[in-house]
């Protein structure tokens, strides 16, 4: 039996529909500073995030048609940067938003693990790292809403 998603989590108390005009992407650091990551919601924010890397890169927002995606960049063979791109979610139910953020968080964690050159991190380290990344992305998603 499938439980109606809205019965699990009523996000209407937390998020309104629409994007905030004031939101600016904020670079976050992974544990031990291997990867920096941020969340963007539109092309303007994508441009600002890429511009802040000083690389001259230009890339369309959500170049691949999907709900959300993480793109990765390496600057001067030093640090990896990940940009989580998620567009308008005004017609999504709150569970779909949470599921998407968790899914994309896993991709950021995969980049972190790769940058650390860690094949088998401890279960607890992995769980705590993913929790940290997810909480940052959830906070940024919340800030990006009106």
Predicted regions and their residues:
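Active-site scaffold of zinc-dependent metalloenzymes
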Residues: 53-95, 108
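Short helix/strand-bridging catalytic loops that position acidic/His residues to coordinate divalent metals
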Residues: 113-120
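Active-site recognition of the HExxH zinc-binding catalytic motif
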Residues: 99-111
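N-terminal low-structure segments adjacent to metalloprotease catalytic domains
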Residues: 1-45, 89
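Structural signature of transmembrane alpha-helix termini at the membrane-water interface
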Residues: 7, 109-112, 141
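A conserved mid-domain beta-alpha-beta active-site/ligand-binding segment of alpha/beta enzyme cores
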Residues: 41, 49-52
């Amino acid at each position: 039996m499938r439980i109606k998603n809205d019965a699990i989590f009523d996000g209407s108390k937390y998020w309104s529909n629409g994007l905030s005009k004031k939101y600016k992407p904020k670079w976050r650091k992974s544990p031990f500073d291997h990867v920096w990551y941020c969340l963007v919601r539109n092309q303007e924010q994508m441009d600002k995030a890429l511009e802040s890397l000083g690389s001259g890169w230009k890339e369309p927002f959500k170049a691949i048609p999907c709900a959300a995606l993480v793109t990765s960049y390496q600057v001067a063979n030093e640090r990896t940067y990940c940009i989580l791109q998620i567009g308008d979610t005004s017609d999504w139910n709150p569970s779909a938003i949470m599921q998407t953020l968790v899914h994309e968080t896993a991709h950021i964690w995969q980049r972190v693990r790769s940058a650390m050159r860690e094949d088998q991190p401890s279960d607890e380290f992995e769980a705590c790292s993913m929790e940290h990344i997810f909480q940052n992305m959830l906070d940024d998603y919340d800030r990006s809403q009106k």
